[in-house]
């Protein structure tokens, strides 16, 4: 059963018969008080209540917050602005009130197949972050249609428009009156629904950790058996000692405080091409692995499934790596536990903050510390040349990491995205976790509210919030069209956030993304089409097409990566598929 109305005011009957809605639009002023965000303690949950105390008091909501609306009549999905309508005025709009400008967005109805008798929630998704400190507003116009005709303003909203708020909502009338005036000044007249909220920075949890993070001084490495492993001279694994903020290896204290040290995983790969190489001649690459994976999945498989072994060999690059805590294979049980008990969400996101801290610590250990003096490196490492290469999760959290360090100047972010709460439902990886969540939170509407709230936990590790830091950086996003794990729409959102330019020839030009031609520099975006279908249009897990993985062995991808991460002349984006876009039938020619 849905919880009672929020913000300290239960539903009350107005003398005119108008009542506040059981679920006010989220986010909005109804979910805030004078101190900031004010989520109620009785949010839907399984065993563990949602830890709203970690969120309440924040000055505003996420820059990439999904709005959730419980419309009282069945809506016609054809009347909603979809992904093909981005940038055109539509029945549902998102506005940056401070800038006086629309924000790219789309709207959709929750497509979960078993709604248990509920009407699907109307979801409004930003496709670019709203600037921190600004106010955002969702506007629904008379162009919205129900299944039986034009949609009408909800009675509670019509009452506010008339200046006669429902009983219990008198304190909100002044804010709505001001909102109506702001919208009218922007040329938005007579909406059938409108609500606004403040936007604030959610990155402090990570920034505070990194501000205290020290450079590690201790590590250990032991040789790995590399028999039968191609492109390999030697490998080592072990750990390094890094600062930790996790209490009992679970989550952070409130507020977060450094909690001693812990051992972080360490992997070292030396390619066969370095046999007999001159001293101090090998660039050092930091590798970011994919979701529910490990560095070994990319560096210790004989079939080289992601082409990383061959790539490192052709680059003549030493590769070092650690794990993304929270979303690495050894932590998979944590993610599953969150699925069964959504109130434990910080167990996942705090670990991922720790994972970014560990990766940053590894970079510092290599660049500023003494790691490369270890005999396992055979004196081969060039201590002046560092690069980053991240795949999937490594492309997502790699963007966060690079935004927070200047020790690595050039990075390739392969099949990465942003906007975690929008991205996950569309991923083929989501299916098992959705089963866990639906077993404990049965209401689809309540789940959509929780998914949107979860973005507040994701914010510290969401690259969309670091677009300004990446806007002048030498980074390259490589997108696989129709990606079944990281929806393309979240990659385009990241490109807008960072001002990355799309390098043509390309498959399609996303709205609001500028184009350029090669050769160029970052921040940049390139596209590779495995011809395995288009990006899904609804919030359901993608079928497993392997589009996410397919381009990794293409020469067009490999040569572009090697060129961008070149040890002596890095940061140049080139196109290696001739006059046409790179596709499965035009994957690029070898040098």
Predicted regions mapped to residue ranges:
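N-terminal cap/lid segment of alpha/beta-hydrolase-fold proteins
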Residues: 222-282
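Primarily recognizes the serine-hydrolase "nucleophile elbow" in alpha/beta-hydrolase
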Residues: 367, 372-425
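Alpha/beta-hydrolase-fold catalytic nucleophile elbow
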Residues: 323, 414-415, 478
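Ser/Thr-rich, Pro/Gly/Ala-heavy low-complexity intrinsically disordered linkers and tails
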Residues: 1-19
């Amino acid at each position: 059963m849905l919880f009672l109305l929020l913000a300290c005011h239960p539903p009350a009957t107005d003398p005119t018969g108008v009542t506040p809605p059981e679920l006010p639009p989220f986010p909005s002023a109804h979910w805030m008080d004078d101190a900031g965000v004010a989520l109620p303690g009785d949010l839907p949950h399984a065993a563990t209540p949602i830890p709203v105390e970690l969120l309440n008091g924040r000055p505003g909501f996420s820059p990439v917050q999904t709005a959730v609306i419980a419309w009282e009549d069945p809506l016609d999905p054809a009347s909603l602005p979809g992904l093909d309508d981005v940038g055109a005025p539509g029945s549902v709009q998102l506005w940056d009130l401070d800038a006086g400008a629309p924000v790219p967005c789309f709207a959709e109805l929750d497509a979960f197949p078993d709604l248990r008798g509920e009407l699907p929630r109307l979801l409004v998704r930003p496709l670019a972050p709203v600037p921190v400190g600004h106010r955002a507003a969702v506007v629904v116009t008379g162009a919205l249609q129900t299944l039986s005709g034009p949609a009408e303003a909800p009675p509670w909203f019509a009452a506010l428009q008339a200046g006669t708020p429902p009983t219990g909502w008198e304190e909100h009338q002044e804010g709505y009156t001001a909102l109506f005036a702001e919208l009218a000044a922007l040329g938005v007249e007579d909406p059938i629904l409108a609500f606004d909220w403040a936007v604030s920075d959610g990155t402090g949890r990570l920034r505070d950790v990194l501000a205290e993070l020290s450079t590690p001084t201790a590590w250990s490495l032991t040789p790995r058996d590399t028999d039968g492993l191609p492109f390999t001279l030697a490998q080592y694994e072990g750990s390094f000692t890094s600062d930790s903020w996790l209490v009992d290896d679970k989550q952070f204290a409130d507020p977060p405080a450094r909690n001693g040290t812990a051992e972080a995983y360490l992997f070292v790969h030396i390619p066969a091409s370095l046999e007999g190489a001159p001293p101090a001649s090998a660039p050092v690459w930091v590798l970011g692995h994919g979701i529910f994976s490990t560095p070994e999945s990319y560096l210790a498989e004989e079939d080289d499934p992601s082409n990383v072994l061959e790539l490192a060999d052709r680059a003549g690059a030493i590769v070092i790596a650690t794990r993304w805590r929270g979303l690495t294979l050894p932590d998979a049980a944590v993610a599953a536990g969150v699925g069964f008990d959504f109130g434990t969400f910080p167990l996942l996101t705090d670990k991922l903050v720790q994972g970014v801290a560990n990766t940053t610590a590894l970079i510092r250990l290599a660049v500023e510390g003494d790691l490369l003096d270890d005999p396992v490196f055979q004196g081969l490492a060039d201590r002046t040349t560092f690069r980053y290469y991240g795949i999937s999760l490594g492309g997502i959290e790699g963007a966060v990491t690079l935004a927070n360090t200047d020790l690595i100047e050039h990075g390739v972010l392969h099949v990465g995205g942003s906007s975690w709460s929008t991205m996950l439902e569309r991923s083929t990886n989501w299916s098992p976790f959705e089963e866990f969540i639906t077993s404990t939170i049965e209401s689809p509407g309540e789940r959509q509210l929780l998914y949107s709230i979860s973005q507040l936990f994701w914010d510290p590790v969401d690259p969309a919030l670091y677009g300004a830091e990446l806007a002048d950086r030498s980074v390259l996003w490589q997108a696989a069209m129709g990606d079944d794990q990281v929806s393309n729409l979240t990659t385009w959102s990241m490109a807008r956030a960072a001002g990355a330019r799309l390098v043509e020839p390309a498959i399609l030009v996303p709205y609001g993304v500028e184009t350029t031609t090669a050769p160029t520099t970052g921040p940049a975006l390139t596209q590779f089409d495995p011809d395995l279908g288009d990006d899904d249009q609804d919030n359901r897990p993608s079928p497993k097409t392997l589009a996410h993985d397919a381009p990794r062995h293409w020469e067009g991808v490999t040569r572009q990566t090697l060129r961008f991460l070149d040890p002596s002349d890095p940061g140049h984006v080139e196109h290696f598929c001739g006059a046409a876009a790179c596709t499965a039938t035009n994957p690029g020619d070898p040098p």
